[in-house]
């Protein structure tokens, strides 16, 4: 049976499908008619092999408690070896309902109330939320933009913050959302050496690991045995195959003591088995979804290149940060001269777009907008045209 869902130009009406991306604009304070390109949720049909596997399981008609069987791990291990050159062991694996849930469990497992947790702003905003919501202190070693139009790590500041704030836990984002960096082995080794030296546990969010367009994704835990011993690696099929509603993530913790502490917090939270449909979807994705994945990856890369060309040609004063990984483009509007409030008004009310405002990723994100380009080209073109027209009208009125 051949893969059927390879038409990524196909525009699908997702309204009235209980879709967070499309159905909850008004509830979230947005105009009803906005075009949404905000949350990291692709507008593509997933692999037909996943669809078929879910339908076949649903036909069984019984949805009792479930657990994984050996093929699940073998399929997962094959994917990690093939795509990320990482050989995992079955006892490392812990399944959770999502990566953000795993971040919260890690905060509880490896820190005490009042402890400092390090992040690198601008970064995926739930990082800050799960730290603060669990009574810990957020400490940031901010990334900085270089002349090469990429973000970089200030390693001196990174270690200084760890020492001065007595940091216990570090949230690494690789690839980094929203700035699109894929950290090199050299950069990761510098981070890891500092964390090992100072007794810092590393939670590495690698959920976007299958979206790399420049460079090579390196699993942090795979680089050195010392890094493996201090790391919690968070992965999921939810981004790669657009399965967020399946509520399943695969967390790898090689260190037995770190694993024991993590499991203890899972037990305290009352989590046990995950839903059978998530398990079925994951097995189908990683065992039969390769053709779909490769085609989707190529389509998204073409959209990224198209966006770059469009911005350079039609949006003076706007810059697209060099994107190495993720399908989330980081647009810099600071040279337009618009204030944060004016930019928000331009995007939301004039362009009628629902993007992710840079300010939600921290103060370092002010003046930026994050746009999801994992959508049909027609949708992306419409969004970019709306920005162009809104910017033109804004300049004429000044």
Predicted regions and their residues:
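Conserved core segment of the aminotransferase class I/II
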Residues: 52, 225-301, 309, 391-393
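Conserved core of the PLP fold type I
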Residues: 63-193, 210-211, 217-226
């Amino acid at each position: 049976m051949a893969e059927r869902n390879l038409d990524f130009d196909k525009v699908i009406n997702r309204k009235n499908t209980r879709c967070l991306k499309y159905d909850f604009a008004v509830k979230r304070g947005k105009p009803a008619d906005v075009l949404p390109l905000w949350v990291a949720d692709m507008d593509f049909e997933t692999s037909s092999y996943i669809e078929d596997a879910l339908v076949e399981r649903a036909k069984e008609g019984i949805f009792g408690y479930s657990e994984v069987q050996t093929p699940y791990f073998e399929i997962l291990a094959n994917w990690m070896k093939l795509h990320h050159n990482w050989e995992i062991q079955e006892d490392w694996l812990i399944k959770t309902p999502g990566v953000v849930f795993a971040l919260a469990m890690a905060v509880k497992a490896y820190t005490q109330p009042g402890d400092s947790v390090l992040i690198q702003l601008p970064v995926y905003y739930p990082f800050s939320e799960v730290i603060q919501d669990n009574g810990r202190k957020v400490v940031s070693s901010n990334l900085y933009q270089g002349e090469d139009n990429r973000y970089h790590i200030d390693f001196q500041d990174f270690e200084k913050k760890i020492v001065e704030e007595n940091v216990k836990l570090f949230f690494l984002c690789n690839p980094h959302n929203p700035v699109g960096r894929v950290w090199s082995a050299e950069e990761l080794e510098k981070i890891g050496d500092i964390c090992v030296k100072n007794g810092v546990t590393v939670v590495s969010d690698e959920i976007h690991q299958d979206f790399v367009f420049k460079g090579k994704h390196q699993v942090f835990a795979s680089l050195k045995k010392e890094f493996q011993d201090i790391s919690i690696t968070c992965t999921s099929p939810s981004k790669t195959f657009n399965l967020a509603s399946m509520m399943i993530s695969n967390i790898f913790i090689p260190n037995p003591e770190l694993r024991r502490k993590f499991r203890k917090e899972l037990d305290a939270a009352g989590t046990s088995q995950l839903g059978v449909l998530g398990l079925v979807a994951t097995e189908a994705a990683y065992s039969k979804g390769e053709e779909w994945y490769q085609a989707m990856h190529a389509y998204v890369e073409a959209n990224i290149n198209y966006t770059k060309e469009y911005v350079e040609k039609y949006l003076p004063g706007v810059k697209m940060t060099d994107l190495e990984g993720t399908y989330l483009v980081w647009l810099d509007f600071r040279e337009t001269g618009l204030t944060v409030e004016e930019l928000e008004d331009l995007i939301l009310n004039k362009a009628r777009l629902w993007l992710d405002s840079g300010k939600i990723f921290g103060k370092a994100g002010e003046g930026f907008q994050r746009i999801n380009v994992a959508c049909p080209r027609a949708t992306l073109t419409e969004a970019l045209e709306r920005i162009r027209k809104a910017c033109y009208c804004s300049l004429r009125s000044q």
